[in-house]
Amino acid sequence: METKKISYFLLPSLMIVALIFQPMCSAFTIAEPYIHPCMKGFCSFKSECANKCIFMGHHKGGDCIGGLDGIYCCCLA
């Protein structure tokens, strides 16, 4: 039984294709800048939300995000 060898052209070609498609695939992932779950009731002022998140240990603070059922305080990741 005869085994076929991978050509010296095919392997580098596949590596180049993989290096091209990897950044393209990673560009389609959605990066969420907020830590979930968001908290309801801390958005009377934006600074109130930021202070609450800093108190919880999230050093970047927080932001008020409006949703269908109210305004939420979401801490920044």
From Swiss-Prot:
Signal sequence interval, chain numbering: 1-27
Disulphide-bonded residues: C38-C75, C43-C64, C49-C73, C53-C74
Superkingdom field: Eukaryota
GO cellular component, one term: extracellular region
GO terms (BP aspect): defense response to fungus; killing of cells of another organism
Locations listed in the record: Secreted
Keyword Transmembrane helix: no
Keyword list, A-Z: Antimicrobial, Disulfide bond, Fungicide, Plant defense, Secreted, Signal
Entry annotated with the keyword Repeat: no
Family of the protein in this entry: Belongs to the DEFL family.
Protein name: Defensin-like protein 91
Originating organism: Arabidopsis thaliana (Mouse-ear cress)
Biological classification of the source: Eukaryota, Viridiplantae, Streptophyta, Embryophyta, Tracheophyta
Name of the encoding gene: LCR47
